[in-house]
């Protein structure tokens, strides 16, 4: 079966009820033939608000969660709470969580495991920084992180892998469609050799670098690029156009 195209809009720590409400209205009203899966990730404070306002045909994701269901963990939210808001996805291991907040591969693996066991879909992020890329260790870094995640996954049907070329985010550098395809292809091969052929064929590997309306068509035409995790650009109304690039 062909893999269902996946577009995630990560709103990060941006917006308020007024601006996000307007964005959601634009999203809901978009007349776009709908073949893929669109998921938007509002700030935690607006999970309820977003799920209430966003058309049910779109998914909503949290941007993070913790590795247990409840307890003395000030400032954290659990998958159970996310589900209680009617939200079905969570983004884990985003480069900002790793590099700004110091989350380790191990912690992210534990979060992935717990979120999946609670029935959430997980967008698990992996990628390498500029110094790692320049040192020629991209594959080693990316496979190592994927392995930690893979060790914690029993059921892959609810996992989307997002490759973030961290070296290209907000730096003005972009990964060419060929560079992206090469890495996505190697990731799929790694899954085939280390998990199973079935998983390798069915898991969506999406691109989490800088995406613009101009680059998304070219990227989406690559055989192993199954969608996007869009950052800042997802706060603009044109975001809705990204979801139609395969048609």
From Swiss-Prot:
Q: Which species?
A: Latimeria chalumnae (Coelacanth)
Q: What is its main location?
A: cytoplasm
Which keywords has UniProt assigned to this entry? Cytoplasm, Gluconeogenesis, Glycolysis, Isomerase, Lyase
What Pfam family does this protein match (any one)?
A: TIM
Stated name of the protein: Triosephosphate isomerase
- Give binding positions for substrate: 10, 12
Catalytic activity entry? D-glyceraldehyde 3-phosphate = dihydroxyacetone phosphate; dihydroxyacetone phosphate = methylglyoxal + phosphate
This entry's Gene Ontology molecular function terms read: methylglyoxal synthase activity; triose-phosphate isomerase activity
Keyword Heme among UniProt keywords: no
